A protein has these predicted regions:
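Conserved beta-strand scaffold positions in the cores of enzyme catalytic domains, especially
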Residues: 49, 66, 83-85, 135-137
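Catalytic cysteine-centered active loop of the rhodanese-like fold, especially the PTP/DSP P-loop
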Residues: 96-145
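Envelope-exposed proteins and targeting segments
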Residues: 62-63, 71, 82, 104-107
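A mature extracytoplasmic/lumenal domain signature
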Residues: 70-73, 79, 87-90, 112-116, ...
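Active-site neighborhoods of enzymes that stabilize oxyanions during catalysis
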Residues: 150-154
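Short, structured coil segments at secondary-structure junctions
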Residues: 79-81, 131
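Flexible, polar/low-complexity N-terminal or interdomain linker segments that lie immediately upstream
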Residues: 2-77
Length: 154
């Protein structure tokens, strides 16, 4: 983690990304624009990940829409209680209905089977490309959730 030269304390991710962009802008405007976009994307990607404790706290607060990115077939077998299906493979078909039901500012927590499953991240990116900005990925997935004994249905 980058350190503040003056205090020796770690720099927050967004601050570090901003400092990198400012430094690069003094070198070349086009180079800085490229790195700025990459830095912002990286910060968003990193900050969008939730662990089990954070996900459970959000679940308990009833403040989010949980989205299962797996296929509908496995969704109907079991899913986080209250989650809706918005599968990676059928996103384009299912999204119009989702958009009608969920406001653009809704907090959305997307998950799939486990941490190595890329479906949740792909669905999260697709949601963000369609205007949703309050999107998080629960990286532990359904396996971790089930092992913790948290509410499920299906």
């Amino acid at each position: 983690m980058p350190l503040n030269i003056m205090s020796g304390k770690p720099l927050p991710g967004k601050l570090f990304a901003t400092l990198v962009v400012l430094l690069l802008s003094s070198i070349s405007p086009s180079l800085s624009q490229l790195h700025a976009a990459e830095s912002v994307a990286l910060v968003k990607e990193v900050s969008a990940e939730l662990d089990l404790a954070a996900t459970k706290a959000i679940f308990d607060s009833h403040s989010a829409c949980f989205v299962d990115a797996r296929s509908e077939y496995v969704y109907y077998k079991s899913h986080i209680k209250g989650a809706i299906s918005l599968s990676d493979s059928r996103f384009d078909e299912q999204f119009p209905d989702f958009k009608q039901k969920k406001a653009i500012e809704t907090l959305i927590v997307v998950y799939c089977t486990e941490s190595s499953c890329g479906k949740a991240r792909r669905v999260a990116r697709k949601l963000m490309k369609n205007g949703y900005r309050n999107v998080r990925v629960y990286s532990g997935g359904l396996i971790e959730w089930a092992h913790a004994g948290f509410p499920m249905e299906g």
